[in-house]
């Protein structure tokens, strides 16, 4: 991609414009490695992006991203904007510099050309700014004049572009631009990290499928730049990948890979782009029951609770019994026998939200991979028993953090390189439960309501541009069409607003901040109630997520 001259006139230079690849149905997971587990093949957050903003600028940037992503799905937390401790002087990029990272959204044109133009007008307003317009000389020429425009939020952040989809699904595509000489090496590098082969591969472009359902595809792609162009790493944005068997992966990487915490490692690709690797499973020795009670008692004395209790779940207590279980209460079928007493003690003690720790305004300060409580061969939340919505619910709870696991934790701030202790823990990475999905009760509803949710969301495009802070979705995390099929799922009503700057610091000694999370009622007799049910006055803690 050339900001001035375009792709040099080659026939395949428009491959990233969406004309060739936007609507083709090449993104099924049939090309993934046979070694991939079901959990890996169906993880929509396998790739995510951290954006580092200057102090006081995170909220408008986060809202701008959420508003744009709402056109694909109202609850698609693939990005998290955080703030660095202090403003830093930026180096002026070379003239005609090409940012190494881009995000391309493919929107279905069947909803009308005006809808795409309306979103394009939104990207022309602050904090968005126009970066450049790409010229395409291939055999497929875009008919919309805006379909080759690229925008950016702030210096050092990814490029953003909108493309019409002629047929097929809507797509969120992460694109990394590679040096001409490093393209082959970069392809092998990301193939190693993603543990899958590209579904479409050309001499200068390839696409890795990340997640696919009936309506949305999430993709990761590489684009080879001409010889006279060099990509510039986005110093205020970092790609994060979930990986398995980090110990086996590290020796195979081309550049040094150093741990920044127990759960995350930092490395670079061949072009100097900073990469975070999050260990999918952190096998950690379980604390003794006495230690759990002691830690819980200590936090009850140190954390003043509001007038209404806040039910929460530890990674273990959030596990639910299979759908066909005859017992009304939760059963920890995935727990080792020796740990039943421990989790019974946790359930009897006053629970604390697993995200109620102190935060700072810096980035990457929290190990996010909790211990896997289910079998590594077949995770409980993706077992063959139970409805898809139930399995997705257990998948969601399987990645919650326990505050007990953070005692003495340290992590390196990727932005500053400083070591940070557990008293300065910051942004939770992509896989802790966000506030809008933190309701502890799932509500299965008739399948026709779930099947109409997606159509209702699309019909909303007839109105003004959706604002994620005001969107009321009719689905919980587990019941979204993003995780389930149209035929059956559970659904709940949830609502959340973007966190205000004052909520970026949550201390153990301050009252817990509630988020609006309406209660829901159990409607399916086959679904056992979870360990804690939200009462009329119960509120949940605001969560930071990507």
UniProtKB/Swiss-Prot annotation:
Region named Disordered: 1-37, 285-361, 488-546
Bias (Low complexity): 24-36, 488-511
Residue spans of biased composition, Polar residues class: 304-324, 347-361
Feature: compositional bias, Basic residues: 285-302
InterPro entries per record: FAM124, FAM124_dom
Family of this protein: Belongs to the FAM124 family.
Protein name: Protein FAM124A
